[in-house]
């Protein structure tokens, strides 16, 4: 049954390469269509290939976490808070580096195995070049918040996931990380992700703001606001 679904999904993806009308399919979204074409033409990925994501060896994962230790420290409490706001909804909250490697994951212990089977574990490389269209990897390429819902994924093995991701930038506009909320539940609709996406965006902005303050903690910072009580001093 899974193989039949993967085969149908692969055929749907391949219609993009043929330039056929996809006005009613997942690729009717321009960002999805662009991503599917990148996966086919630039990365030469197979949408029907069902293998687990590449995982960094332990030493390299530790190095990656050390490079972003300050971001991980700042993001930890925000990720826990975000997970609590989504409590009971079957979500995993993930933080990756700028390459798409998962550096932290917050989820309910009872649901950890579900997300591990989906390939969402520490050290997994979810870059678009490796895993095709997905919340993390496509967010990195597009440099904007987005939701990838089920069949909008490139690989058939990922079509059980719904992922809402937001980029995290440093004070100089460089991509630092991606904050992602993923669900493996079938009942999750795309419309329901509007609320989730808003929460992810807010959390990503909070991480950016805290990182900005930490980065310039030895500098004078000027705050301006039309209302004095909103300056935050």
Task: Label each PLM-derived region with a short phrase.
Residues 1-127, 138, 144-147, 160-161, ...:
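Intrinsically disordered, low-complexity terminal regulatory regions
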Residues 130-135:
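Tandem CBS (Bateman) regulatory domains
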Residues 153-157:
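A short beta-turn/loop motif at secondary-structure boundaries
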């Amino acid at each position: 049954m899974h193989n039949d679904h993967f085969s149908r999904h692969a055929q749907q993806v391949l219609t993009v390469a043929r330039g056929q009308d996809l006005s009613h399919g997942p690729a009717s979204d321009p960002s999805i269509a662009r991503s599917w074409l990148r996966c086919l033409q630039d990365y030469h990925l197979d949408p029907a290939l069902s293998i687990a994501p590449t995982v960094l060896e332990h030493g390299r994962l530790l190095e990656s976490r050390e490079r972003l230790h300050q971001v991980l420290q700042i993001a930890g409490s925000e990720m826990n808070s975000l997970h609590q706001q989504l409590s009971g909804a079957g979500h995993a909250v993930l933080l990756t580096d700028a390459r798409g490697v998962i550096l932290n994951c917050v989820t309910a212990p009872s649901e950890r195995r579900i997300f591990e089977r989906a390939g969402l574990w520490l050290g997994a490389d979810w870059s678009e070049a490796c895993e095709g269209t997905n919340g993390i990897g496509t967010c990195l390429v597009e440099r904007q918040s987005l939701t990838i819902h089920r069949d909008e994924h490139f690989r058939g093995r990922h079509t059980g996931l719904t992922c809402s991701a937001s980029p995290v930038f440093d004070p100089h506009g460089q991509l630092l990380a991606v904050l992602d909320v993923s669900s493996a539940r079938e009942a999750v609709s795309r419309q329901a992700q509007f609320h989730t996406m808003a929460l992810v965006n807010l959390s990503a902005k909070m991480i950016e703001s805290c990182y900005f303050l930490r980065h310039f903690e030895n500098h004078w910072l000027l705050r301006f606001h039309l209302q004095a009580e909103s300056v935050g001093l």
